[in-house]
Every structure is written in structure tokens, then in C-alpha cells.
Amino acid sequence: MSEIFDVNAAIYPFPARPVPLDTNEKAFYREKIKTLLKQRDAVLVAHYYTDPEIQALAEETGGCVADSLEMARFGNNHPASTLLVAGVRFMGETAKILNPEKKVLMPTLNAECSLDLGCPVDEFTAFCDSHPDRTVVVYANTSAAVKAKADWVVTSSIAVELIEHLDSLGEKIIWAPDRHLGSYVQKKSGADVLCWQGACIVHDEFKTQALARMKALYPDAAVLVHPESPQAVVDMADAVGSTSQLIQAAKTLPQKTLIVATDRGIFYKMQQACPDKELFEAPTAGEGATCRSCAHCPWMAMNGLRAIAEGLEQGGGMHEIHVDEELRQQALIPLNRMLDFANQLKLQVKGNA
């Protein structure tokens, strides 16, 4: 696999951690959110990586907890006129692309994603223009503007199948933005993949030596790894997959102890799926290294109860997602192409992001 344009050196400033709420404040905001959801004809859709109390509230109020694409599709099928998306900004954009007639609000428009930040549209356009013979495949974790430049949008659970399909047609691929997922897909498919060099700041921190030491402490444990992790970590896995695939693996694997290499937000739904199993976070530091994310996306952490209440209450420019209509139409083409491909394969598209 060819690899150029290394953006790995970028250090993204993390947002300030939300001020913790006490028990009374949490109860106050939960009730306020429930009231505002009814008043605004809104539904709360939360990503697997948000904090457990947010996921619980989404389920309690008739919303959903899912990956970014399923969040958008749930919103499309739900009768509510407003979607409150608890996640990061590209997830709100995806919801708006697929639901243009609905108002899409977010707790904050400043919730970024290192994969999105690491693939700016102008640089990516120039990169694609310099390789006009290649089919452009971008991960769901990208801006609407980058999606609009792509031939295909893809989620992690369908990535290998799609690249195998394109390879069978003799097509050469540009893959963006995650280099680890790109490497994984190339290794599984054998396709000619030219990979953009972005990375998820959470998954990029998982360490092989520290994981090996943890595995030695729990020799009977199964290791579950998201493919946005480094290849050496993926090679240690008993199961590799997207968020929904890892939850399914946790249910079906015979081991009662699981070491999980993805954002710890997934533990809420994973523990629901297998309450009899013991879950451990895979280590993100060791051998003299320190972690920055420490297995939890700092931008996902911005989706607190107070911020959700403010998003519903204030709406407007500080919270509403807007996507230019021409751009939306362009981004919708590769998204629909992926959905059609998945339906043909009779796959349920459940990605990460």
C-alpha cells in the first residue's frame, strides 16, 4: 500500500472538560431535557461513545444509541421534526444530509473529530486531483465537504466488502482519512490502496506492550479491537470490528473476561449486551508513554446534560446544523451509493465513528 501526505504530526487542542454536575443538578437537567424534547417535538440520538448517562437518557426518552449512520437513519424514520444529535459535528452533518427537512441540533458545534480535522477539504481535493485514475472512498468520519468529493462513503463494518468489490472491478483506491483502517482494509482485501494519513486520537493511543502485559494478567480474556487501532494492536485481537460488531462479538465470544480497545463509552451498551461478563479497557499508555485521550474522546465528552438542555433551549446559530443544499446533494450521492451496495449484499450498515 502506498502512503503519502502524513498529517500525523498535527496536535489538536483538546476542549476543556465539562464542569461536573452534582446529583441534584443531574436530576434537574434530566427532567428539563425530557420536557424540552416534548416541547420541541425532538428526539435524542446519541453515539456509542457519549457518556453512559447520555446514552441512558436517549433510551429512556425513546431515542436511540447507535453509530453515526444508524443515528441518522433512526432520525429519518422517527416522526419527530427535530433531531438532537449527541456526538461530534460530522454526525450532525450526516443526519442533516439524510434528513434535510428536519431541524438538526447539537449540544455544541465545537465537538470535533481528529479524523475530520485531519482531512481538510482543500488539501484533500488537491490530493485526489493528483490521482485522477483512482476511485475515492472516504470514511463516515469526514465533513460534508469531503464526502461531496468522494465516489463512495463507507462505514467500518462494510469497508472490507466494498474495497474487495471495487478491487474486483480493477479499480485503484484513494482511502481517507484513517490510515489504520485503510491499512486493515488493504491487508484484508489485497487491493491497491493509496492512503491518507489521518488517525483517531483515541484508537491511535492503544499500545501493544501494555496490552500484552494486560493479557498476561488475564490470560483467559478475549481481546476486542476496533480497526482504527494500529495494525500491531489489531494483530493481537480475538475479534476486530466496528462498534456494533464489537458489541455483537462481546455477546457471542465464550470468554467471560473481555479487554476492549475502543472508546470506553461503548461499555454502556456492551455491558447491557453481556451483563455476566467482565470488561476491561485496553491500555492507552505504557513503556514511558502517556495518554492524551485515555480511551475517551474529549469532544464526545462535551455532550453533557447541561449542554444538551442548552441545545434544545437555545437552538439557533450556536446549536443548529446547516449544510448548503448543493453540497448536501453532492454528499448524498456517495452515501446513497453505499446504502444501495449494502442492501444488495443484504448487510445491515452499522459503522463507527
Curated annotation (Swiss-Prot):
Chief location category: cytoplasm
Cofactor note: Binds 1 [4Fe-4S] cluster per subunit.
Residues annotated as binding [4Fe-4S] cluster: 113, 200, 297
UniProt xrefs under InterPro entries: NadA, NadA_sf, Quinolinate_synth_A_type1
Listed name of the protein: Quinolinate synthase
GO cellular component: cytosol
PANTHER family assigned: QUINOLINATE SYNTHASE, CHLOROPLASTIC, QUINOLINATE SYNTHETASE A
Entry's Gene Ontology molecular function annotations: 4 iron, 4 sulfur cluster binding; metal ion binding; quinolinate synthetase A activity
Species of origin: Yersinia pestis bv. Antiqua (strain Nepal516)
Subcellular location per the Swiss-Prot or TrEMBL entry: Cytoplasm
Enzyme class: transferase
Listed pathway(s): Cofactor biosynthesis; NAD(+) biosynthesis; quinolinate from iminoaspartate: step 1/1
Keyword terms: 4Fe-4S, Cytoplasm, Iron, Iron-sulfur, Metal-binding, Pyridine nucleotide biosynthesis, Transferase
Cysteines joined through disulfide linkages: none
RNA-binding as UniProt keyword: no
Enzyme Commission code(s) on record: 2.5.1.72
Family: Belongs to the quinolinate synthase family. Type 1 subfamily.
Pfam entry (one): NadA
Function: Catalyzes the condensation of iminoaspartate with dihydroxyacetone phosphate to form quinolinate.
Catalytic reactions of this protein: iminosuccinate + dihydroxyacetone phosphate = quinolinate + phosphate + 2 H2O + H(+)
Gene Ontology terms: biological process: 'de novo' NAD biosynthetic process from L-aspartate
Cofactor(s) listed: [4Fe-4S] cluster
Binding site for iminosuccinate: 47, 68, 139-141, 156, 226-228, 243
